[in-house]
Amino acid sequence: GLIPIGWLGASALCAVVANERARLVGVIAYAAVPLPYAAVAGGRHQVLIAYAVIPWALHLIRSFGGIGTSIVDDEPGDVVNHPSTEQRIRLVAKMSLLFGITLAFSPSVIFVVLLSALLWLLTAAISGGSTRAAGLGFAGALAATASAVVLNMPWMTRYLSSDGWSAIVGAPTHTPENLGLWNVLRFGIGPAALGGLIVLLYVPLLVAPLVSKNSRFIWASRAVILSVVSIALALLNSADQLPFRLPETGILLAPVASCLAIGAAIIVMAFGIDVRGGRFGWRQPLALLSLITLPLGILPVVAAAPNGQWQQPSSTLAQQMKELLGDTSQGDYRILVVGDPRLVTSDQHAYKSGLTYALFENGDATMLNQVSSGSDEAANLVQPLLDAVALSSTKRVGRLMAPLGIRYIVIPLLDRVHSTSDSPLPLPLGFREAFAEQLDLRNVYGPSSMVIFENSQWIPLAGMLSTVAAQQSSEGGSNALVATELTGSIAVLNGTTSWDSPSQEIPAGRLHVGFPFDSRWTLSINGESVKPQASFGTVMHYETGNGGVAELQYRNPLSRYIWVLLQTLLCVLVGLGVLQPK
């Protein structure tokens, strides 16, 4: 549904021209851009979010600033039509709601929106537009961003950590993407780039400032400057030639798609107002040439649309992991996926040498089963384990991973999008071999798209410890773990999560729970509560006494309910702003 939302946003944005035919042409040009289809093929959901959000955001920013619609008999400069106070309240509320939802899923898109609004302000100063209106639009975008941050508290605090910027723009890669100018111009971020005819849509974009007048010239200038800067940033960021990292190429190119739509709409309107009927010169053939390129530029998407597959791979890495590693009959477990950021599923945590890692429960690589990369678990517990492998400080890393329930380690190699058999993404030298040298990791037969190691020492996320493991669990520290045979634990309470608490008859002994110690996890046996105790130095266990019917529950702190109540009130407040009478 994100792609049609983007089309509707382009329709709203192209309303800057007071000509329905020109507006329709702009929407068609936006739909012809292969960016979202390449994102679908490559599984880049953040690019899809950018494609859907950015035209709506630019439309609301324009409306808040008071930049009006280009009309036939306008004067030089922007058409300014400042909204009333009530209208501005409604517009900033809409922006806050849009930015709040976007920030929850893709904060890097908000960064690109603010950059676009700033470039519009600079364009107004250069081309003779209304700097006051553009400045008001930028101020409205900043206010909406602040509101969006508040709406997403306290979860936004994860971006204040040491790797907060990586969480926003993505982790650095081992090798740069280095797409090159041609691929950037044709939005070639994935297999469904649809050839090179799309570059013909740049002709109307570049010609529009040359043949248009008055407010149409200002809008054409905005589109050209924003697209040129966006393309330059995407090109430099792709080649890793900037002193800082920016969002991925597809997100940086999303404003260019909006600019192509504006350029197409402006050239159609300008041809009928500023070109046709005037003294014959170079402007007429140039404008006519740009009109001819429009249908040619949309041909690829028209040809590819009936199939609807957009060259997607037949199966994804996540689907393969679910099929191969989804058996939970022996208890709940975790999968540690570590590799190139372009192959590791989202919510990754940055490691060294351009690698990232992510944790999933029970082989299901979905958002609900991900262990947040912003948690202390990912930052404090997993990284030292990877360090131990990289430094060869132990040959028993499987035993160190066992308390966390890590059963499989997956190194993705090929996704048939970013990494193919003909052009695989390289891994750091000796990376695979370091895992293969571990004595308690067994190389499992799997597809060529990934390397799978199974931890022979893994302990179920919830399980009754074996006698030997129970004796050593109170010792803590890596030395006790490495020296202990941890097999033989019995899985219990399968399916336990912070929101689901199944009950089961369990025997006497020591119940291991593979979560970092948290007193809010409570075990009840026959209705009596049991307090958790530290286990293996990182996780926790419960003494079950004589056993009985057990249930493991997570009790949310009072602050969680206060935050939910506060967020609900804020959302109601924003909703009232959206419903402000016109």
Residue ranges and their predicted role:
Residues 3, 244-273:
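Hydrophobic/aromatic-rich transmembrane helices and adjacent perimembrane loops
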Residues 271-300:
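Signature aromatic-anchored transmembrane alpha helix within multi-pass, membrane-resident enzymes
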Residues 404-479:
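Aromatic/acidic, Gly/Pro-rich catalytic loop(s) in extracytoplasmic/lumenal soluble domains
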Residues 136-218, 250, 312-324, 331, ...:
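Periplasmic/ER-lumenal interhelical loops and adjacent helix-loop junctions
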Residues 475-582:
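Active-site-proximal, structured, solvent-exposed surfaces of multi-pass membrane proteins
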Residues 295, 326-408, 412-418, 472-485, ...:
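Extracytoplasmic/lumenal acceptor-recognition loop(s) of multi-pass membrane glycoenzymes
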Residues 3-16, 21-126, 140-156, 335:
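Membrane-embedded helix bundles of polyisoprenyl
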